[in-house]
């Protein structure tokens, strides 16, 4: 066994190169999925509004995402994350071609972690507002608005799904990049 030259090291042959390329392709796919999640969330939230007449057509209540600063933060944060992910796509393609690139992958991990923090903060803040919109808070005399603005609440709830999905994909991206770096 000692003369065979194998001492528990992984082979750097064609199989290892194929696995590295597969990880890079998976990285690209995850980035595209994260772009879709963050962009769809930002668009869904940013285009959400509902008008409800109050007694007559002349007196109306209008609810928009921009009425709540937390939801504005949600749109901006998801837009920033989406822009970053779009900008990172060419670098991810470079990793498919040159899977041995190390420093660019470190840079991507750093910014992926920053975007994960941003999307997590936005999704969490948005979830808190959506919870209040659905349930209200009796002790603070905040009434649930989703009984009146049901379309508005459905859209903002739906936009949270894309953002939380993007969070999961960003976590997978970070883990995938760490595995790819560990294989070097």
From Swiss-Prot:
Sites carrying sugar chains: 49, 137
Principal location class: membrane
Superkingdom of origin organism: Eukaryota
Transmembrane regions: 23-43, 73-93, 106-126, 160-180
Topological domains annotated Cytoplasmic: 1-22, 94-105, 181-184
One GO process term, biological-process aspect: cell wall organization
Subcellular location: Cell membrane
UniProt topological domain (Extracellular) ranges: 44-72, 127-159
First and last residue of the signal peptide: none
GO cellular component: plasma membrane
Role description: Regulates membrane-cell wall junctions and localized cell wall deposition. Required for establishment of the Casparian strip membrane domain (CSD) and the subsequent formation of Casparian strips, a cell wall modification of the root endodermis that determines an apoplastic barrier between the intraorganismal apoplasm and the extraorganismal apoplasm and prevents lateral diffusion.
Family: Belongs to the Casparian strip membrane proteins (CASP) family.
Subunit structure: Homodimer and heterodimers.
Stated name of the protein: Casparian strip membrane protein 3
Organism of derivation: Brachypodium distachyon
Lineage: Eukaryota, Viridiplantae, Streptophyta, Embryophyta, Tracheophyta
């Amino acid at each position: 066994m000692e003369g065979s030259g194998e001492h528990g090291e992984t082979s750097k042959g064609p199989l290892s190169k194929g696995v590295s390329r597969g990880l890079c392709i998976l990285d690209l796919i995850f980035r595209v999925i994260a772009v879709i999640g963050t962009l769809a969330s930002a668009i869904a939230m940013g285009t959400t509004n509902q008008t409800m007449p109050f007694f007559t057509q002349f007196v109306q209540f209008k609810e928009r995402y921009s009425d709540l600063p937390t939801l504005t933060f949600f749109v901006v944060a998801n837009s920033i994350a989406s822009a970053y992910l779009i900008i990172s796509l060419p670098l991810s393609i470079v990793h498919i071609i040159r899977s041995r690139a190390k420093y660019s992958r470190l840079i991507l991990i750093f910014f992926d972690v920053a975007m994960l923090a941003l999307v997590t903060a936005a999704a969490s803040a948005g979830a808190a507002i959506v919870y209040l919109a659905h349930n209200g808070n009796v002790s603070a005399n905040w009434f649930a608005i989703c009984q009146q603005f049901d379309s508005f609440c459905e859209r903002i709830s739906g936009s949270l799904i894309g953002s939380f999905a993007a969070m999961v994909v960003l976590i997978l991206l970070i883990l995938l990049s760490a595995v790819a770096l560990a294989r070097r």
